[in-house]
Amino acid sequence: MPQYLETFLAMSKKVLVEYSRYPIAFVALFVQIFLIIVLFVITSFAFETPGTGQAQTTRFAAMMAYGFVTNIILSFTLWEIGFSIREEQVRGTLESLYLSPTNKFSNLLSRVFAILLWTAAISIGGLLLVSGLVGGLPVNNLGKALFVLLMTTTGFLGFGFIFAGITIRLKETAQILVNGVQFFFMIFSAQVFPFSVLPLAVQDYVSRWLPVSYCVDLFRTTLIGEAPELLPNDVLVEYAIVIAFGIVSPIIGYFYYNWIDRKARTEGTLGEY
């Protein structure tokens, strides 16, 4: 078996064993996500225009729910790849791990493998919950939507690699940056509401310049079965942006992480608390 595959399997098993030791935390996270989703749905009902038809209510709920799936993946990727490096530093195991002949790419990927399984379960459960609250969610073009979600996830891996490098440099302070990035994309990439809610200036000068915005837009409008909000007349352009993001982002992120890793080894700061 190739060494990189052995590393990936061993580290994935380690992460799964860690999660299995904290079942209460696992259940608590499920409950937390469900409560957040219910809060968003109820809030959307509160601001609903009187006389709005069921179709419009379902559309808005679908926009929120499908967008929130991308938010969950982004959040878990940042924390599990990015900030979990910090956890290894605190435990005192990062330096010995990275001085061993393990494949660094497999090590980083293993951190997100288990959490993606977890994320999939949470996402499916959350979507079923919203579907029950609003009387069903539209599910169209499932194959295309899953492809877009795959490209979105690989693009987020690049963010995770970058934040893993930043965490080595900033250590505990990186928490603030991770939280800031989460809320930045939640707002400006409209992950929990339609882009039409944002002021036109924000859409033109911020949202349209973020690849994440096109990932969110294309994923949820594909499932809903309507034209994208950002580029309604250029769907192929949105696909090109999403595919480019999914391919280029992890490459850039991994090279950045390797650069920070080598620099930290040279300076002797890799295992510093």
Language-model features: where?
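Hydrophobic transmembrane alpha-helices and immediately adjacent juxtamembrane helices
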Residues: 1-138, 142-164, 168-273
